[in-house]
Amino acid sequence: RRVLFRSQSGWPYPMEPDKITGTDYVYFHRSGFGIQPGGTIRGPRGWNGGDYRESLKDISYPVICHELGQWCAYPDFDVIDKFTGYLQPGNFEIFRESARAHDVLGQNKEFVYNSGRQQVRMLKEDLEANLRTPYIYGFELLDLHDYLGQGTALVGILDPFWDSKGYVTPNEWRQFCDETVLLARIKSYCIDRAKNATISIPIEVSHFGRAPLQSVRIHWQLEQQPVTEYTYGEHGKTLTQTVFQPPVLCGTLKQRDYALEKNQSAGCIYLNMEDIQPDCAYVLRVSMKANGRIVENTWPFWIFDSSKLNQVSAPDESKAESDTHEAVFITSERFHAETLLNEGKRVLFELPYEDTSYDCPPVRFNPSFWNSQMGPTWARGMGMIIKNAHPAFASFPTTADGGWQWQSLIENARGLRVEKLGCDCITNLVQPIDEWNRNDKMSLLFECQVGTGRLMMTSINLEQDTPQASALKKSILSYMKSDAFEPQGQVSWKQLSSLFEMNDVMKELGAKIDDDSLSACLDGNPQTFMRLTGGYPYSFIIQTTQKHNISGILYMPRQNHREHEGELRSYCIEAWVNDTWKQVQKGKLSSSYEPKRIAFLQEVYTDRIRFTALDTFSAPGKSCFWAMEPDGWYQKEADTTANPEFKGQLPQDIFSASVINLLLAEEEETDVWKKRIKQRKLVHLEDSKQVVNNLQNVTSEKSATAEIDN
């Protein structure tokens, strides 16, 4: 018999790959000290036709990747009925009731399918990158089915009972996970025809079957993405109809033999962009016959043409003034949007990232990795639901579950919490799916009536320099200028205002903190944080350049610690008034990652606030354990005599915060916001002029400054 030895399992090697010795093979997921030097051998760094060879430079042993593919999909709550034995699905019941509370339970089947398709995209990229990488000769996929422990990791394409979830077939799975796999090195799935006359795609073969392949020809064809229709019923998503299109381009690669090996070049596919119609979705299909069976793989493409997208005549301002029926006004300023809507105009409102409420977290294209209880983040993603049959997407190709053409569009967008509007009167055109531990009901693009005005609102940056952003904006504007733009739901401007918040208010106020090491909490960014250690209470002073009417404080806990380290519980806030400190609020908070808005007993006119953290949800300097109380999880002091295992677990007294912002009185906040808009206008005026010159039937935003002045 043969015995194989390895020196460790799973965790990163604390050395460069060429320094690893004394083993028969290497099993890990990261080399070197952290990411550099060396690096990861799983995840996005090897995607888009790449690989992980730099992470394995000069290694002497074959490598197996540890726990690849921990991408999650949303839970199907029908699985609850399968638990008929001793194990009770309490976790799924909690997730279901959270979904019910956030008004998304009725979308469960859509969430399952669309998040599942997003999960499959990630798994395909991970596995193909693994197969493209020299020296990697295997992987441990975590897992084929859902894992119920450690926070509930819904990482499987099968449910906890090893049953199919219904969003990927065995044949599709074998395309990228089989003994023989066809691979392509595709740098981007979104192609700008104006900048690429020809696309070259190297094809490789990874083959570990029973015998080598002899005299094999590989065939390829580029076809328009088939149009698929589904219905949702009692048993989930059911295919109604799929309409396939004839190939646009096709060809055959040179006949070759393939050994039992990977990284075997099969040749190159060349796509002439002149032969391909833009603003369409395509599928590249590559296939061959291997030992009596057909081996096939497919990849999506979205073709755009930036030269045609930019060929838009300047706006006819006189027509815009006299014929408002077809005029569309574009703005990123809330007061300008309000004025236009009050006048009955059609408005595309692009809400900037930094002007969005802290109740609206960023959206992430990649799904949660393992789960957010073990690895919490402010930004989360589980795929999306798109009303792809809506006329707003008439010239922007998309399926209902999205695709790679959305990646750059949503990565820097905030999910607008439409549940905060207090009504269900919007048409949600692009809905990101939130992770099941939070279940926020959100939107990236929606339409509604506001008074007599018609609003299309988005948190997507449509001004970014990508062909897909230009194509989406053009498609939206074409719809908004048409007679079809008749939003049905009515929403008040006051309701919409719940989505706005000045994230950089402390910068506008010139706020400083008396300890520079704590300044991270004043940057307005919940993805950074400050951390104090020592002993309670912790006090610090925030001072502004001049006095303001202050009505409260916004506090956001640290967003990325699984144990809510340093999360504030009890506090005292004082203001410097008449040369003395005056208490303006004192109290306790509940435990959650949500922003906490602490209203003062009354508004104060001051330039100094003293913030004191009296204690947090952590036991002060004691051996501890975690316990659930009605208002959150607490670290409680442990009896180390009765429980010796707790001995030595001595946490420090820690206070942390990701954001501490002053809340201004309403009138003062409006003044600061308008001043900020003027400054932004002056900085971007020249860029705005150029943008306006390229928009058809759009009234220039240059007038917004004058309107705000008034």
What is each PLM-predicted segment?
Residues 39-47, 353-358, 370-468, 484-490, ...:
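Catalytic beta-strand/loop cores that center a nucleophilic Ser/Cys/Thr
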Residues 142-209, 657-658, 663, 674:
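Aromatic-rich peripheral "rim/lid" segments of glycoside hydrolase catalytic domains that contact
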Residues 197-256, 266-272, 280-289:
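Beta-strand-rich binding/interaction modules
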Residues 612-619:
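Short beta-strand-plus-loop segments that form exposed binding edges in beta-rich domains
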